[in-house]
Amino acid sequence: MNKLSSIEVRNKARNGENFTTSGLAQGYVQTNVVIIPKKDAFDFMLYCQRNPKPCPLIEVFDPGDYESNFATKSDIRKDIPEYKIFKDGKFSSNSTDITEFWRDDFVTFLLGCSFTFENELMKNGLDLPYFKQGKNVPMFITSIDTEKSGKFSGKMVVTQRWIPREKLVRSIQITSRFPNQHGTPIQVGNSSEIGIVDPYKPDFGDPWIPENEELIPVYWACGVTPQIAIQEAKLEIMITHSPGKMFLTDLRDEDMAVI
């Protein structure tokens, strides 16, 4: 499915198919999604602005709108492979279609995702085995506090990729070109420095067991971070994408690159 267009991936999700989007529609920008009531939207937008590394804003919808300006004929209620619904800060259910939950006061936020720069990493010879294995990137809750806004606060979540020592500098250079997709790493080589006790046991996604000692764990900020903040805020209702199952836009990766 890596040769599909963004529209084709959205249509598969709209038809009820449930799948991980890592490696799909390569070259198209993928985003994290957060949907919350209007009364909480300003504080959350400020939270994103204060924490641009894990929460890079791509688009904010008007209340009640469900079509993205960056995805032709899209429907945010149906075009994600799987959603997570939270009520009063607690997980309620998963769904492949949130039309029945939709409200006119819902505000949708699209946030940058590191899947965007993965294509560039692979072009430069970096192996990301979870693509071939149909698995999800490892994600960890760190000990790093995010900057508070109103009721929103929490720990930063990161993604993990094991990078060959000789390609470490190149991987940092590549990801630095994508500040709206988390940019440069948060930490390189020392998992415990950011509170990760066991780098082989992620909080979300699938474990990545390195093949040799030349691979170094590298951590990038992750768009699952706001899900943690919103859960702790105990909003009456929140809807997000499921980790690793993103929204595909029609934007191209090169549209996001700064150099």
What are these regions (language model features)?
Residues 25-26, 149-153:
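Short, flexible turn/loop "capping" segments at secondary-structure junctions
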Residues 1-111, 123, 158-259:
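Metallocofactor- and cofactor-centric catalytic cores in central/energy metabolism, strongly enriched
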Residues 93-150:
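Aromatic- and glycine-enriched beta-alpha-beta binding-site module
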